[in-house]
Each structure stands twice: as C-alpha cells, then as structure tokens.
Amino acid sequence: MLMSAVILLSGSLLDPNPGLIFWTAITFVLVLLILKKIAWGPILGALEEREKGIQSSIDRAYGAKEEAEAILRQNKETLAKAEAESDRIIREGREFADKIRAEITEKAHTESQKMIGAAKDEIEQEKRRALDVLRNEVADLAVRGAEKIIRASLDGEVQRKVVDSMIADLSTKQN
C-alpha cells in the first residue's frame, strides 16, 4: 500500500521513476530469493516427480503393450499348434477307423470262407455217407439177387423175373 501511495503522489505511472524501479527490482529479487528458498525446490521437485510418474506410466504402458503383443503372439502360436494337433488326431482317428474297418472286413471274409469250407466239408462227408449207404444197399441187393439167381434155375425167364424183382425192391427202398 505504501507503494501505491508513492506512485500516486509521484505522478504518472508511465513516467520512469528511478527510485521506484530500484525498489521494485529489490522487492522482485527478494521475493525471488524467498520463493527459491521456500517454494522453488518443492515446486521443481513436484514437477520432476510428476514428470517421473508420467514417464513411468508411459514406460509401463509400453511394457504392457509389448507384453500383450507377446501374449497375443504366444496365443496365436498355441492356437496354431492346437489346430495342428486336432488335425493330426482327426487324421489318426480316420486312419484307425479305416484300419479297424479293413480288419473287420478281412475277419468277416475269413470267417465266411471258413464257414463255406466247413459247409463244403460237411456236404462232402454227407455225400460220402450217402454213397456208402447206397453202395451197401446195392451190394445187399446184388447179394440177394445173386442168391435168388443161384436158388432159382438159371433159365432166361427165371433170371428175368429175378431182375424185375430186384428192380422192384430197389424202387420201393428209394421211395
């Protein structure tokens, strides 16, 4: 306030007054020194701390971005590996199914061939048995016929009757 009164008493504000300039400069320097001692250090410290905090945040953000990109690359690689693995498993499954199908088909074919062979063998055995039975019957008939021929006289008419009788016996046994 004292300064304001001095300025007003001295005249115009635009007129240079050396005393006023001197005291203004001294006051400015004193305020500057006081601020430097008291406030300048904490203000600069706070600004530096703020700058360090901002730089740290930027560095962390870049680090997080790089880490996220690395994780993304790793996830893509893992996904590609998983897809390749699933393709391999599917391919192996199909190959295994084809192999099993071929084995089952081969086994069924082998079994059917065995069954056909067994059936043929059984048919052949039945055929042999039937032929054996037929031979035995023919032999019996021949023996009976020979027996009848020997018992009967050997004239032609008797022989014809014996043969007709044997044929009749044979036809009755077949039916």
Swiss-Prot record:
**Presence of keyword Plastid:** no
Q: What is its main location?
A: membrane
Q: Name one Pfam family in it.
A: ATP-synt_B
Keyword tags: ATP synthesis, Cell inner membrane, Cell membrane, CF(0), Hydrogen ion transport, Ion transport, Membrane, Transmembrane, Transmembrane helix, Transport
- How would you describe this protein's topology in the membrane? Single-pass membrane protein
GO terms assigned for molecular function: proton-transporting ATP synthase activity, rotational mechanism; proton-transporting ATPase activity, rotational mechanism
- Functional note: F(1)F(0) ATP synthase produces ATP from ADP in the presence of a proton or sodium gradient. F-type ATPases consist of two structural domains, F(1) containing the extramembraneous catalytic core and F(0) containing the membrane proton channel, linked together by a central stalk and a peripheral stalk. During catalysis, ATP synthesis in the catalytic domain of F(1) is coupled via a rotary mechanism of the central stalk subunits to proton translocation. Component of the F(0) channel, it forms part of the peripheral stalk, linking F(1) to F(0).
* PANTHER family in UniProt: ATP SYNTHASE SUBUNIT B (PTHR33445:SF1), ATP SYNTHASE SUBUNIT B', CHLOROPLASTIC (PTHR33445)
Q: How does it assemble?
A: F-type ATPases have 2 components, F(1) - the catalytic core - and F(0) - the membrane proton channel. F(1) has five subunits: alpha(3), beta(3), gamma(1), delta(1), epsilon(1). F(0) has four main subunits: a(1), b(2) and c(10-14). The alpha and beta chains form an alternating ring which encloses part of the gamma chain. F(1) is attached to F(0) by a central stalk formed by the gamma and epsilon chains, while a peripheral stalk is formed by the delta and b chains.
The UniProt entry's sequence similarity note says: Belongs to the ATPase B chain family.
Query: What's the protein here called?
Result: ATP synthase subunit b
